[in-house]
Amino acid sequence: MDGKRLYCAGGTAAARYAGEYLRHFYVDLAERPGGNVGAVLLDVPSFAPDGTLRMGGSVENLLAQLPPDVTVCGGNLDHPALDNYRCIDFLKDAQYQAENAYITAECAVEIALSYLPMTLRQCPVLVIGWGRIGKCLGQILHALGADLTVAARKDADRAMCRGLGYAAVDTARMVETLGKYRLILNTAPERLLTKEQLAQCHPDCVKIDLASKTGMEGDSVIVARGLPGVHMPESSGRLIVETYVRLCREE
């Protein structure tokens, strides 16, 4: 960044770990915002639902303390105050998304184990969706011996699941067998299972929704978003730093 310093403006545990890891990469850090800052690193994601920074305060106040040519790094940076700034959005980087998906999957398994009254070995599990997180969940759960079924829309995806040793079901027909599962993990960001449909589940079925938009309806559903920063902040912080260093080197 033209010899200027990086200012870490995050307020989460992941951001604190990121600050520690940045020193391992010999990144020149600024202790406070000022004219010597070439880039600012926000939390990932960077904003709360009300548009304020997750660290607290407004992004406008933060930017007022920084040079007009500062580079803003973070996640979900589609904020109107940033329209005239150069932004590096980690959540649009494919490598970051892939590595973050694995951390998310591991966090989800940790949550599931804290609620299940049984081990994952031979536990009937349904994973809904065959995206990045769904694939990572499949690998982990299969390795732990779960009786795994993946719900996917595409014939090719279901064929891949069967080739990997998982059972597969068309998403449109998964409701027919809901009663057999003791753990359901949704990764699809759309409403797929209603409260009435979920009433068919086993009384002790653990239902965890990982999607950005809720896919399962009902009070019994555990809505789990932003897991890496909450459950594994060190791994999340390290990934943020590795992504920052990599993207800067690619410029």
Indicate residue ranges for each PLM-predicted region.
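Adenosine-phosphate binding glycine-rich loop
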Residues: R86-Q122, M216-E251
